[in-house]
């Protein structure tokens, strides 16, 4: 807000100074352009139009510059906030270290292949980075339990998407991506959580994160499960296409994987 106020004040002062300059100097400028009285009269008649055009252009340039600077400042602040969240989560559970980064990387690859651009691709990146932030309230003994979870423990685990939604929606600059976090455990067949959304009722960005999240979870080491080979994980994705996962997303993922397997072997490259 302080930056925005300073930028607006700068624009207003610049506009006022140019206005005063034009009022007191425009006649001299016209005289320097021409000594012919008929030409001078024509220029005098149209100088107000010229002033409007010139100041409009200058205002546009200044506002545009201010906007981009503000965007960069907000993005840096947003990045710092997200990194604080992720650092806290990784401190809480060492097995999540690198998971958020990997899911964001995979999700972005898929999003670009689907033609996402600009703010939509940014939203995907931030949502994927923070998709598991709600796990920060899940007791570590439940997160890393090797035995099958009981009903109470499973409910606590499932609540992490709701908690993540609540955390992120409280931040003005991030709340627009909170719904993608909320729905990243929905299933294509409607058997997911928290709301049992089905098919394209599930937001596209959540569909993407679901596949990226599952891929990294299957191909990563965890205390409570065996790490799958890439071939085994591919089989799981294909076998659950149209049930757990959106067919379109799986098709895109397979195309990307077949063209560049190394891009989807995060554990080996980090």
Task: Give, region by region, the residue ranges found by the protein language model.
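Electropositive phosphate-/nucleotide-binding environments in soluble metabolic enzymes
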Residues: 23, 46, 50, 79, ...
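Metal-dependent catalytic cores of enzymes that make or break cyclic nucleotides
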Residues: 86, 90-270
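N-terminal membrane insertion elements
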Residues: 1-68
């Amino acid at each position: 807000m302080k930056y925005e106020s300073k930028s607006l004040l700068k624009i207003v002062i610049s506009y006022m100074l140019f206005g005063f300059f034009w009022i007191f100097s425009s006649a001299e400028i016209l005289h320097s352009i021409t000594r012919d009285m008929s030409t001078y009269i024509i220029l005098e008649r149209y100088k107000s139009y010229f002033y409007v055009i010139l100041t409009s252009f200058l205002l546009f340039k200044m506002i545009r510059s201010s906007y981009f600077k503000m965007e960069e400042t907000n993005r840096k602040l947003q990045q710092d906030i997200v990194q604080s969240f992720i650092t806290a989560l990784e401190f809480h559970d060492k097995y999540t270290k690198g998971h958020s980064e990997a899911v964001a990387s995979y999700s972005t690859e898929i999003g670009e292949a689907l033609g996402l651009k600009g703010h939509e691709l940014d939203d995907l990146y931030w949502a994927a980075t923070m998709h598991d932030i709600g796990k920060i309230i899940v007791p570590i003994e439940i997160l890393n339990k090797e035995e099958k979870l009981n009903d109470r423990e499973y409910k606590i685990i499932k609540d992490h998407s709701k908690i993540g939604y609540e955390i992120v929606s409280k931040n003005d600059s991030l709340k627009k991506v909170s719904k993608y976090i909320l729905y990243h455990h929905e299933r294509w067949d409607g058997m997911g959580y928290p709301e049992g959304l089905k098919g394209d009722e599930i937001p596209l960005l959540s569909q993407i994160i679901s596949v990226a999240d599952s891929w990294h979870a299957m191909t990563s080491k965890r205390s409570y499960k065996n790490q799958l080979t890439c071939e085994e994980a591919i089989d799981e994705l294909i076998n659950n296409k149209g049930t757990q996962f959106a067919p379109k997303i799986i098709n895109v993922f397979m195309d990307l994987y077949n063209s560049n397997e190394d891009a989807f072997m995060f554990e080996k490259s980090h």
